[in-house]
Structures are given as structure tokens and as C-alpha cells.
Design a protein with these regions (language model features):
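Conserved beta-strand hairpin/beta-sheet module of binuclear metal-dependent hydrolase folds
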Residues: 1-46
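Active-site HxH/HxHxD metal-binding segment of metal-dependent hydrolases
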Residues: 35-82
Length: 82
């Protein structure tokens, strides 16, 4: 079963998602826009273990906290080459 959590982050209200596999509690963070602390809170509340960050595209409002979140969890970032 998959669960989806979301937060609206940053100056332009970008949607950041946490996709959680409830069978193993692993998750993927999508578009960590801003406010790493808010992302960490969302992860803690879900009880999940992030496995990766997925960027839908490279605009500033979708990647603002990507490196900090990557370093915090020791996970990789995946993005399209476009």
C-alpha cells in the first residue's frame, strides 16, 4: 500500500511530496522545495525511511532544500537530464 503526504513549501507555494511504501516504510521525497526542517518533520511523522529524492525539474522552487536533505539522509538525488 502506498501513502502520499504533502506540504506546500517555499515562497511560491511548491508542493513537496513524500511517497511512502507502507509495506516496508521506505519513502521517496519529491521536489524538496524549501524548509528542510519541514521535510524532516514530515518524514518523522510518517515513520518512514527516505531512500531517494526525485526532482520533477530543476527550477529553484523545486530544488531549494535538495542538497541539505540529501546530506541529512545520505541518499541520492534523481532528476531528468532535460
Amino acid at each position: 500500500m502506498i501513502k502520499i503526504e504533502s506540504r506546500v513549501l517555499g515562497p511560491v507555494g511548491t508542493n513537496c511530496y513524500l511517497i511512502i511504501n507502507k509495506e516496508n516504510n521506505e519513502s521517496i521525497i519529491i521536489d524538496p522545495a524549501d524548509s528542510p526542517e519541514s521535510i524532516y518533520d514530515m518524514v518523522v511523522r510518517s515513520g518512514s525511511k527516505p531512500q531517494a529524492i526525485l526532482l520533477t525539474h530543476g527550477h529553484f522552487d523545486h530544488i531549494g532544500a535538495a542538497n541539505e536533505v540529501r546530506e541529512h539522509y545520505g541518499i541520492k538525488i534523481y532528476a531528468s537530464c532535460d
